[in-house]
């Protein structure tokens, strides 16, 4: 992949993504199967046509119906026996050219509409170019280099896109497509999630170029859809109403707001017009019930009168509303005042839920979808057999052959690093299957805690004083064993209630106890108090806080207390453990800074909240201590807008902490999808360089830019049962793959660095987009695996390198800093809580960390 010049005069050099420097050899070989299936493609040219459908802006489903109807209708004159494939937008491919003039052809197509009304469309088809699969073979086998991919080159001329469209054509007609997955309504089984939502199962399918061949990646997939049901039932599920007939009163304000939030944007169909099931999109819920909600009705004599919705339905449809006390749905355009009583509407089937699931729904979803690795492997194999690609007429038309057995891959299990602890006996821990423990070990550098406070936001009934006393005694014992002694009793221990009391209490503590190191906050479950504690502690007063759920105070376990100590020690400037120095890769021989970066976006369907960009940087040579920077930026923008100034801040902090200037920058970037690689790399690599040059004009450290991806569907399974690990039968921690299923010539690899506990482990995918430091495959794979062992919050190796994980935590914490107190106290009648309508300066200030907290790992 190459990046076209985009400078003022096109002066920027082409950025060539590095080629693979060779293959890794370290580690113990392991035989694996991957859910990738080889696709054999003929060495032919296919023909690309541009399709233009008017009226445009129709959903892809409708476009597909139009094209399907067109192919049937013009079979004799144009299409003959050809079976074109279509991507649902503007690209149509055929195996043989169509008899159309170079200027194109215009066709009229009609689809049957609702209620006997036909829908007319105008379709124009125009030849664009040939697409060569012969060239694709040459690139896959390494015989020719691909031409530079310019930023503005259309995807439709890409031969890989053509392969993808062929394989997706039939499933797109049969199922409900969502992204790269296909779903169908549950038949004979039911997986309700509550709140009017349910689980639909389906499969993911995507085509990827691999070494010497094209691979089809197939995986089982599940997502939440809205249940097709009467709107009244939907409302009852959302509001936890067990029997609507026992609710003769109108909805309360807070109920109406909650219901509006859930149903807004959904499609409903009406039931009061016989077979004419007209569909509408909901834009609001009325404040007034159907018995009082009025609208201007035009009579036959031209006069306009006010009618209530209930009256209108009685007069027009002789329908006496059963629930006139309930509100109406406002549908279509806001200004048009179209109202429908809830009882004549059903939720339209097949609508995917894009809104965020609640915690309960998420946990139900995980339980319904988690499969042990062997079960998932079996399910995927079943899927591929039932997909029966050899009978797919479109796959046949283009002469594809899809193998129905998983790809055999040889991976390697990398050696785990040893971890150095402190104390008198300076013990070393050796992880086994990605896990180790603290028993008999002390922190590498433990903090002594002399002055600390407790604020209990659980009630005295929930958490009596003797329970608190027991908890502090246990915590002090475990902290002493861990080498982080908490001395004496807390200087302050009080009960408090509600988020409003956080700030005054913390101010009192700050003013009264100089040298206060830590406030332990006890929370009564999920509460707005948490966000307020973090806002006041992190941004307003600069005080270290550690929250604990009351259930863990009432019933203490050594494991929970030990995990608390891991977090507390780091927040107060301690070091839990370090990588044993002699086993680290050679990149550590000179000063090096590790950066992790992530952007988190607001939940789908929320256009007002900003996206949050976070970048963290290591501050020592181990690397164990990190410093954070965070910014708010335009919603849904993936590029980190202010990266240059964030990296500059971190380089300055690194210099202050170590008195060295890094000669190398290793940048792990989370959350970028393949389609965005080029734009993001182009902007961000230049921003990192700009940060360096702004400090000293000749300062040019070597930069390595690595994208970390977890949101992909490649899964690896042990070919030999005896190699499976744990109850879920997963691949061992440290399993690495950089052959067969990886990119034909770019530098990428899969690494599963964690031990799978539930379900099937998902290996992380690493793609090196820039490398001034000329890493070998072994060096970078080992470095990445070692960094997965340096995450301070647990004694396990995690699934992505610590810096990338910390960036995610920092961005997540900033979401809490943005919560408005006044909005979040309860579900009031105003729009719920975050950062709505606040100006950019106020948002930027809200996520700004207090000077005293800035250099600590407050996010741990």
From Swiss-Prot:
It comes from the Eukaryota. This is Protein argonaute-3. The modification N-acetylmethionine is found at residue 1. The gene is AGO3. The keyword Nucleus does not apply. Interacts with EIF4B, IMP8, PRMT5 and TNRC6B. Interacts with APOBEC3F, APOBEC3G and APOBEC3H. Interacts with EDC4. Keywords: Acetylation, Cytoplasm, Endonuclease, Hydrolase, Metal-binding, Nuclease, Phosphoprotein, Ribonucleoprotein, RNA-binding, RNA-mediated gene silencing, Translation regulation, Ubl conjugation. The modification Phosphoserine is found at residue 825.
């Amino acid at each position: 992949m190459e990046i076209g010049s985009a400078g003022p005069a096109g002066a920027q050099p082409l950025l060539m993504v590095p080629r693979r420097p060779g293959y890794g050899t370290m580690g113990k070989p392991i035989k694996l199967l991957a859910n990738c299936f080889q696709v054999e493609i003929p060495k032919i040219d296919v023909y690309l046509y541009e399709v233009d459908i008017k009226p445009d802006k129709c959903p892809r489903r409708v476009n597909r119906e139009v094209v399907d109807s067109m192919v049937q209708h013009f079979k004799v004159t144009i299409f003959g026996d050809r079976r074109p494939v279509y991507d649902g937008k503007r690209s149509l491919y055929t195996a043989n050219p169509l008899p159309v003039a170079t200027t194109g052809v215009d066709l009229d197509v009609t689809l049957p509409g609702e209620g006997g009304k036909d829908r007319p469309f105008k379709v124009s088809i125009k030849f664009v170019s040939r697409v060569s699969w012969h060239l694709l073979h040459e690139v896959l086998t390494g015989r020719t280099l691909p031409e530079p991919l310019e930023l503005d080159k259309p995807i439709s001329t890409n031969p890989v896109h053509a392969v993808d469209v062929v394989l997706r054509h039939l499933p797109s007609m049969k199922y409900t497509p969502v992204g790269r997955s296909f779903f169908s309504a549950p038949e004979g089984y039911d997986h309700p999630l509550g709140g009017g939502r349910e689980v639909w199962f389906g499969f993911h399918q995507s085509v990827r170029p691999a070494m010497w061949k094209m691979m089809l990646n197939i995986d089982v997939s599940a997502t939440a859809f809205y249940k097709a049901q009467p709107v009244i039932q939907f409302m009852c599920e959302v509001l936890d109403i067990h029997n609507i007939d026992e609710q003769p009163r109108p909805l309360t304000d807070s109920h109406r707001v909650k219901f509006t939030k859930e149903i807004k944007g959904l499609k409903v169909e009406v039931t009061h017009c016989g077979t004419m099931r007209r569909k509408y999109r909901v834009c609001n819920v009325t404040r007034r019930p159907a018995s009082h909600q009025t609208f201007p009705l035009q009579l036959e004599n031209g006069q306009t009168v006010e009618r209530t919705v209930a009256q209108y339905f009685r007069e027009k449809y002789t329908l006496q509303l059963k629930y006139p006390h309930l509100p109406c749905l406002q549908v279509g355009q806001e200004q048009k005042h179209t109202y429908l009583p809830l009882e004549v509407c059903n939720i339209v089937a097949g609508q995917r839920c894009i809104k965020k699931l609640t915690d309960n729904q998420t946990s139900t979803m995980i339980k319904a979808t988690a499969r042990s690795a062997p079960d998932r492997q079996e399910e995927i194999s079943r899927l591929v057999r039932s997909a029966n690609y050899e009978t797919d007429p479109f796959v046949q038309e283009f002469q594809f052959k899809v193998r129905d057995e998983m790809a055999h891959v040889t991976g390697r299990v990398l050696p785990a690093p040893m971890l150095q602890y402190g104390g008198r006996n300076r013990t070393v821990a050796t992880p086994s299957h990605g896990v180790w423990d603290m028993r008999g070990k002390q922190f590498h550098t433990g903090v002594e805690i002399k002055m600390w406070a407790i604020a209990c936001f659980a009630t005295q009934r929930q958490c009596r004083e003797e329970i608190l006393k027991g908890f502090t005694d246990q915590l002090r014992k475990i902290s002493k064993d861990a080498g982080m002694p908490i001395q004496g009793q807390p200087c302050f221990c009080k009960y408090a209630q509600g988020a409003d009391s956080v700030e005054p209490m913390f101010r009192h503590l700050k003013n009264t106890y100089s040298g206060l190191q830590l406030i332990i906050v006890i929370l009564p479950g999920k509460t707005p108090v948490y966000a307020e504690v973090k806002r006041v502690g992190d941004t307003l007063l600069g005080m270290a806080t550690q929250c604990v759920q009351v259930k863990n105070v009432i019933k203490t376990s050594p494991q929970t207390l030990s995990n608390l100590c891991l977090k507390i020690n780091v927040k107060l400037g301690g070091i839990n453990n370090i990588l044993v120095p002699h086993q680290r890769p050679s990149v550590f021989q000179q000063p090096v800074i590790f950066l992790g970066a992530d952007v988190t976006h607001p939940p789908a369907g929320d256009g007002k909240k900003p996206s949050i960009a976070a970048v963290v940087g290591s501050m020592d040579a181990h690397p164990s201590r990190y410093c954070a920077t965070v910014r708010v930026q335009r919603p849904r923008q993936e590029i980190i807008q202010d990266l240059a100034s964030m990296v500059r801040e971190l380089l300055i902090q690194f210099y202050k902490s170590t008195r060295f200037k890094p000669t190398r920058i290793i940048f792990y970037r989370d959350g970028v999808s393949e389609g965005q690689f080029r734009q993001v790399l182009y902007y961000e690599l230049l921003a990192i360089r700009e940060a360096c040059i702004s400090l000293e004009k000749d300062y040019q450290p070597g930069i390595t830019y690595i994208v970390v991806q977890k949101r992909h569907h490649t899964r690896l399974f042990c070919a030999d049962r005896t190699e499976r690990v744990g109850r879920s039968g997963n691949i061992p921690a440290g399993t690495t793959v950089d052959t067969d299923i990886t990119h034909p010539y770019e530098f990428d690899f899969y690494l599963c660095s964690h031990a799978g506990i539930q379900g099937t482990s998902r290996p992380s995918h690493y793609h090196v987009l820039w490398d001034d430091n000329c890493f070998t495959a072994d060096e970078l794979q080992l470095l990445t695996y070692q960094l997965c062992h340096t995450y301070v919050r647990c004694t396990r190796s995690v699934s992505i390198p610590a810096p990338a994980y910390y960036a995610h935590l920092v961005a997540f914490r900033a979401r809490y800093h943005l919560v408005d107190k006044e909005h979040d106290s309860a579900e009031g009648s105003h729009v719920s809580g975050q950062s709505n309508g606040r100006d950019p300066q106020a948002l930027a200030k809200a996520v700004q960390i207090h000077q005293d907290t800035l250099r600590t790992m407050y996010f741990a």
